[in-house]
Amino acid sequence: MINTHNGVKEKGIKRIDIDDYPAIKAHLDSFYQQLEKRQDKGDTPYNLRNCAYIEDFSKQKIVYPNMTKFMPFLLDKKNFMTNQKCFIMTGEKLAYLTAFFNSNIFKICYRDNFPDLQGGTRELSKIFFEQVKIPDVEDSIDIDFDILVDDVQKGNDNISLKLEKVLILALELEQYEEYILNYDINLK
């Protein structure tokens, strides 16, 4: 990915000077006419438009798609960039939030907050997330979620059930445990 950002003037972050990268400039020069016509260019045709949140890509964050059937949320601890339209969340208790958003509890309670598009796909835009009320947990519990979410993201499927049970306990939903654990999103 070529990130020739325009900098963040308010924070003193300078724009990328394409002349510092002659091989990339030579490649982009073959598209110069198209670059020059762009409405969303930065200070030069080589630079992207201003992005006030560019530093958020270098933070731990939750990454999730704009539209999806399965509502997957990934905790990114390695500062990845995406090449598709995705959303990101930064802030506190990201491991807990990742666990919560991937849980049956979230799907049962909030799936209908997100518009149903064709074929059962849901739109996960920010405006719909703003309507979601997320139960808070103690900071000490977030550490447990951090370990469990890491294991799930490494492909340890056995941990998914444990993670769901930890959420049930943390949110005091034991009386609904059987329903939550047996919930099948495909039947809805």
Summary of predicted features, one role per range:
Residues 1-141:
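Polybasic, glycine- and aromatic-enriched phosphate-binding surface used to engage nucleic acids
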Residues 23, 31, 136-188:
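Non-catalytic DNA-recognition/assembly elements of restriction-modification systems
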